[in-house]
Amino acid sequence: MSVVELEDGVYESTAVIDNGSFGTRTIRFETGRLAQQAAGSAVAYLDDETMLLSATTASKNPKDHFDFFPLTVDVEERMYAAGRIPGSFFRREGRPSTDAILTCRLIDRPLRPSFVDGLRNEIQVVVTVMSLDPKDLYDVLAINAASMSTQLAGLPFSGPVGGARIALIDGTWVAFPTVEQLERAVFDMVVAGRIVGDGDSADVAIMMVEAEATENVVELVAGGAQAPTEAVVAEGLEAAKPFIKALCAAQQELADRAAKPAGEYPVFPDYEADVYDAVASVATEALAEALTIAGKTERNDRTDEIKVEVLERLAEPYAGREKEIGAAFRSLTKKLVRQRILTDHFRIDGRGITDIRALSAEVAVIPRAHGSALFERGETQILGVTTLDMIKMAQQIDSLGPENTKRYMHHYNFPPYSTGETGRVGSPKRREIGHGALAERALVPVLPSIEEFPYAIRQVSEALGSNGSTSMGSVCASTLALLNAGVPLKAPVAGIAMGLVSDDVDVDGKVEKRYVALTDILGAEDAFGDMDFKVAGTKDFVTALQLDTKLDGIPSQVLAGALSQAKDARLTILDVMAEAIDRPDEMSPYAPRITTIKVPVDKIGEVIGPKGKMINSITEETGAQISIEDDGTVFVGAADGLSAQAAIDKINAIANPQLPKVGERFLGTVVKTTDFGAFVSLLPGRDGLVHISKLGKGKRIAKVEDVVKVGDKLRVEIADIDNRGKISLVLVAEESAESAESAGDKGAEKAEGAAADVTPAEA
């Protein structure tokens, strides 16, 4: 569809996404109406109900002292978008939600490499969620909105970038699925890319992928749905390309009509050619030798020594250009690493291209933790720690996403000492949030249902040592820790990071493009390579995937080969993990025991009591924690089984009542004394009377208070229940009680509230 001028200076373009029997979605871009003082602004609509405003601005002067590109992406969730007032104390939006931070990362990853190298002007992209249909997810629309506003801003940007979410539903890849449709999906992918080439040769270069198996994938596959294997994932990447092409075309049409003229922005190359030639002439031989050292610390120490020597030798002829010398040295290092891989299939640490570093796995490493594990892969070391608690400890989420609670929480920590450096510690940075979210998505598909395992689960991954893919190490450590905590996973999950190096290579006088996929990449191979490809999964299918590439597209056969390599590595890692633990352990004695019972919905109020009086009294008397859901599900947690059972019996006495019987015994509490006897609480709302004549053990007493007082515990037996339901009690002799217990007759005598469930009635 061509661009439409809605009014003077206001233009619109549209992309229609046809999903066949799953319906169509319409993405509309508009510019010229809102945020006109920004360098570029655009409003993106999804079916007219979901509306995002994106504004891109650039600083007037470059930060030439920076050695990086200062791009900032912010996503502002406005709660009015969903017709809600923020739940915070001040009733206004504060720090960004996790969803907003993850969306920032989704936008940044394909946008950043699309800017010209050497740009040092500060660029800020702000995406504001202004309206959100509850059936939609806004993150993918935000990628397109950010690309559109940046394309309009007249910046040195090689866009547009298109982003599409596709889900595998009933064997069909559906673009921009609704939340309801995603419940039927087995796999969900966000794919971003841009068009390369012209005319018939035009293709979509995939720049970024974020993918995951859905929460109910195991059940769907068992019911006959297609499993998300490596081959299926590769098909999904191809299926996303037509949708991305349509989105890029709509953006380009609007940019051709309304974009500002390209401005002149100075670029600051990291170094000039003369500096690189000088560095190469003095450092190549020594650096090539240093890069054969297998150990990371020793290798880094030696390359640092060489760098100092180079700076000293070139200090006089290249005075004042020390930063260029440092950048050229890094570029030379990158070239040597890549050349060795491409020509010799030999890596920095001496491994072959498919070799995995030494693996080790150990469980139960933290004494009082509910579950813990230590996973090591080479110099990458991850400690996983699992904590179990009541469902009421699930995270409460106040954001625009469809989730309002999260039962499984995965937190990733990356302290500076993990790389032998100093740095800030404290609240998590965006990278840590992103890595934790990736590991969380990898494990969610294999978690047991809340009915099977009624616990809130917090998983913490501590990166104690880092040299390549701590996020995938976190997946492995977390699987081990969860099993050690007794969590009945549907299947163990492992992860591996893949890399790619490509270049034109002279073979027998002919130049050909060569691609080499690397298994289990080091940190340096990640930095110097063309692709960072993280794959997690079970032995049967992929559960999570993340891809970032610096290339203009990766041939499908290369990607398929990398996926196959990743599966081989994953199976090897799973075997090592199985040697440490291959089934859920017994739960830790320090973990709470949680039992689930069901009560009628109309009895919830009685269980809670006025102002929580009843539920608080049960908690105080038994020591158990109690959480009640709106559907009548009650979670009872306690440090031991006896406390939990006592609480359950008290709840059942209120909500699922049964009449007590003559002869049943109780350990009751004296709640009232009178001239004629003592009233003893047997069950919530059910008291019985011990007559004064029965309190003296055969002796006459003048005053009830001489024998018992309010709060005393008495062992009593029901002697009679009259036709009005009044209960008469007698004391149980201690000798009798003890002999009954020693004989194993504990079923007849109950703790207070542990007898059958009765309807509260007047004693």
From Swiss-Prot:
**Localization:** Cytoplasm
SUPFAM superfamilies of this UniProt entry? Eukaryotic type KH-domain (KH-domain type I), Nucleic acid-binding proteins, Polynucleotide phosphorylase/guanosine pentaphosphate synthase (PNPase/GPSI), domain 3, Ribonuclease PH domain 2-like, Ribosomal protein S5 domain 2-like
- Could you tell me which Gene3D superfamilies the record lists for this protein? GHMP Kinase, N-terminal domain (3.30.230.70), K Homology domain, type 1 (3.30.1370.10), Nucleic acid-binding proteins (2.40.50.140)
Q: List the Pfam families.
A: KH_1, PNPase, RNase_PH, S1
Q: Its Gene Ontology molecular function terms?
A: 3'-5'-RNA exonuclease activity; magnesium ion binding; polyribonucleotide nucleotidyltransferase activity; RNA binding
UniProt domain KH: residue ranges: 592-651
Q: Which InterPro entries match?
A: ExoRNase_PH_dom1, ExoRNase_PH_dom2_sf, GPSI/PNP, KH_dom, KH_dom_type_1, KH_dom_type_1_sf, NA-bd_OB-fold, PNPase
Q: Which GO terms describe its cellular component?
A: cytosol
Sorted alphabetically, the keyword list is:
Cytoplasm, Magnesium, Metal-binding, Nucleotidyltransferase, RNA-binding, Transferase
Q: Does the keyword RNA-binding apply?
A: yes
Bias regions of kind Basic and acidic residues — which residues? 743-752
Which parts of this chain are annotated as the region Disordered? Answer: 739-763
Q: Which reaction does it catalyse?
A: RNA(n+1) + phosphate = RNA(n) + a ribonucleoside 5'-diphosphate
**Known EC number:** 2.7.7.8
Superkingdom of the organism of origin: Bacteria
Function according to Swiss-Prot or TrEMBL:
Involved in mRNA degradation. Catalyzes the phosphorolysis of single-stranded polyribonucleotides processively in the 3'- to 5'-direction.
Q: What NCBIfam families does the record tag this protein with?
A: polynuc_phos, pppGpp_PNP, PRK11824.1
Question: What name appears for this protein in its UniProt entry?
Answer: Polyribonucleotide nucleotidyltransferase
Q: Which organism is it from?
A: Mycolicibacterium smegmatis (strain ATCC 700084 / mc(2)155) (Mycobacterium smegmatis)
